[in-house]
């Protein structure tokens, strides 16, 4: 029997996924500590914890898609929650990446005597910012234009154009990741080469990791758009992906200026 309700909120059914995700996080944390201290079984527990977390993410998000797309539980009021929550998530990511860029800027503006009092540190070879770093900077900005194209196509009800635009977005993202992989392969320094190597690989590496997450996000949105899940009235998932992607492509300007250019001149 279908029960009616007099409010626009979604009262979720009991779910096992919060506790399963918590157990996966616990196993990952304990396994990671055991692995770093060379305890027997640490690698196995770490792997099982990561697998458990990935499985929980998949089935939990699957249930959310069913509730929103097939069951119609996500009213306009309900959609405000994910929107506000994702905006706060992006703000937290901005603070995280800003801390990494700030660490690099601080070390370059006030180099200590241990690294020769100069930046880059004495004896450290750096990448030429006019080569792969410069070539790789317009790519995420171009992919941001492609995801905006996809957004306008969804609002106009043009499903095929939205799919094409998302394919373009993902393709540019893969090119960016490939170039960054080449950059790391050709890098004359490593993460253990003084404060320069630590800040360089942490900041650029985490930005690259965010690009990979955004790529997966866009792939899922492309598949959902192809299957007809997204409409001009209901596309919160795509909006979150678009916001995230614009965050990623704009942030690219900061490591290029503060790390590649400032550290390579």
Curated annotation (Swiss-Prot):
<comment type="function">
    <text>Component of the cytochrome c oxidase, the last enzyme in the mitochondrial electron transport chain which drives oxidative phosphorylation. The respiratory chain contains 3 multisubunit complexes succinate dehydrogenase (complex II, CII), ubiquinol-cytochrome c oxidoreductase (cytochrome b-c1 complex, complex III, CIII) and cytochrome c oxidase (complex IV, CIV), that cooperate to transfer electrons derived from NADH and succinate to molecular oxygen, creating an electrochemical gradient over the inner membrane that drives transmembrane transport and the ATP synthase.</text>
</comment>
<dbReference type="GO" id="GO:0005743">
    <property type="term" value="C:mitochondrial inner membrane"/>
</dbReference>
<dbReference type="GO" id="GO:0019646">
    <property type="term" value="P:aerobic electron transport chain"/>
</dbReference>
<protein>
    <recommendedName>
        <fullName>Cytochrome c oxidase subunit 3</fullName>
        <ecNumber>7.1.1.9</ecNumber>
    </recommendedName>
</protein>
<feature type="transmembrane region" description="Helical">
    <location>
        <begin position="245"/>
        <end position="265"/>
    </location>
</feature>
<dbReference type="InterPro" id="IPR000298">
    <property type="entry name" value="Cyt_c_oxidase-like_su3"/>
</dbReference>
<dbReference type="GO" id="GO:0004129">
    <property type="term" value="F:cytochrome-c oxidase activity"/>
</dbReference>
<feature type="transmembrane region" description="Helical">
    <location>
        <begin position="81"/>
        <end position="101"/>
    </location>
</feature>
<comment type="similarity">
    <text>Belongs to the cytochrome c oxidase subunit 3 family.</text>
</comment>
<dbReference type="InterPro" id="IPR013833">
    <property type="entry name" value="Cyt_c_oxidase_su3_a-hlx"/>
</dbReference>
<keyword id="KW-1278">Translocase</keyword>
<dbReference type="InterPro" id="IPR033945">
    <property type="entry name" value="Cyt_c_oxase_su3_dom"/>
</dbReference>
<dbReference type="Pfam" id="PF00510">
    <property type="entry name" value="COX3"/>
</dbReference>
<feature type="transmembrane region" description="Helical">
    <location>
        <begin position="16"/>
        <end position="36"/>
    </location>
</feature>
<feature type="transmembrane region" description="Helical">
    <location>
        <begin position="200"/>
        <end position="220"/>
    </location>
</feature>
<feature type="transmembrane region" description="Helical">
    <location>
        <begin position="162"/>
        <end position="182"/>
    </location>
</feature>
<keyword id="KW-0999">Mitochondrion inner membrane</keyword>
<dbReference type="InterPro" id="IPR035973">
    <property type="entry name" value="Cyt_c_oxidase_su3-like_sf"/>
</dbReference>
<comment type="subunit">
    <text>Component of the cytochrome c oxidase (complex IV, CIV), a multisubunit enzyme composed of a catalytic core of 3 subunits and several supernumerary subunits. The complex exists as a monomer or a dimer and forms supercomplexes (SCs) in the inner mitochondrial membrane with ubiquinol-cytochrome c oxidoreductase (cytochrome b-c1 complex, complex III, CIII).</text>
</comment>
<keyword id="KW-0472">Membrane</keyword>
<feature type="transmembrane region" description="Helical">
    <location>
        <begin position="41"/>
        <end position="61"/>
    </location>
</feature>
<keyword id="KW-0496">Mitochondrion</keyword>
<keyword id="KW-1133">Transmembrane helix</keyword>
<dbReference type="InterPro" id="IPR024791">
    <property type="entry name" value="Cyt_c/ubiquinol_Oxase_su3"/>
</dbReference>
<keyword id="KW-0812">Transmembrane</keyword>
